[in-house]
């Protein structure tokens, strides 16, 4: 969500597609939306296209959201046996790519057909990792999935880097995880972004207030400066291809 809101505030036309059934991004951006117009319908109904489920986000001139739904948990079953199911999202985003400067896809942590759709549709991948030991579980499997997608369905997919989230520089654990992340980055043939997002109350307060971190914590919170620095790094990667 940080990338989508940050770029929208900088004047880019942005579409955020929330594919995580927890819907954290959706909850943080909109108070209410039509439960029949979500990313679930986008993935499971052949006739539903992006404009039918994209919701303008209040407070932004140029940010649209395809919200998540709890019914996303049924996608795996409903798309079982569907020919070329991993291309559904790619085909539908292709139809609106000229309407936006940037399309951001928020995915669940599990490796399923939803994530395969996202990886097949994406040009670039940014991997967020929380500063705890459990976040490293499944990273090797993700690396294998990415390589398989690059080989079979999306050769243009590249990995921009890994973002360390909820970082506390005062703990030995966070320092150890930072060192371990460099080894993880080698698996993906990528880098760890220099800018980290520290663990801060302002992040959760911003979500509860349904504001972006840039708006809510503009009062001087250090995590806002983290976010701006990270956004600048990511922007540079996007511009350089």
For the regions a language model picked out, list residue spans one by one:
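P-loop NTP-binding core
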Residues: 1-241
């Amino acid at each position: 969500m940080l990338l989508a809101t940050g770029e929208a505030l900088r004047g880019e036309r942005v579409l955020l597609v929330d594919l995580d059934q927890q819907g954290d991004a959706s909850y943080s951006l909109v108070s209410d939306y039509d439960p029949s117009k979500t990313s679930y319908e986008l993935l499971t109904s052949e006739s539903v296209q992006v404009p039918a489920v994209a919701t303008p986000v209040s407070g932004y001139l140029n940010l649209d959201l395809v919200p998540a739904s709890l019914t996303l948990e049924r996608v795996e079953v409903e798309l079982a046996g569907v020919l070329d199911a991993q291309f559904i999202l790619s085909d539908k985003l292709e139809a609106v790519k000229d309407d936006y400067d940037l399309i951001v896809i928020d995915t669940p942590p599990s490796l399923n057909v939803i994530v395969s759709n996202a990886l097949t549709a994406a040009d670039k991948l940014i991997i967020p990792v929380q500063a705890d030991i459990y976040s490293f579980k499944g990273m090797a499997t993700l690396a294998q999935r990415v390589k398989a997608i690059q080989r079979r369905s999306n050769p243009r997919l590249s990995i921009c880097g890994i973002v360390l989230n909820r970082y506390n520089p005062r703990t030995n654990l966070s320092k150890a995880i930072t060192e371990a992340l460099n080894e993880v980055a080698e698996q993906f043939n990528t880098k760890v972004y220099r800018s980290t997002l520290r663990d801060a109350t302002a992040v959760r307060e911003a979500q509860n207030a349904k504001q972006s971190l840039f708006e809510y914590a503009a009062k001087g919170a250090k995590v806002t400066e983290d976010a701006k620095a990270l956004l600048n790094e990511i922007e540079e990667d996007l511009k350089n291809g």
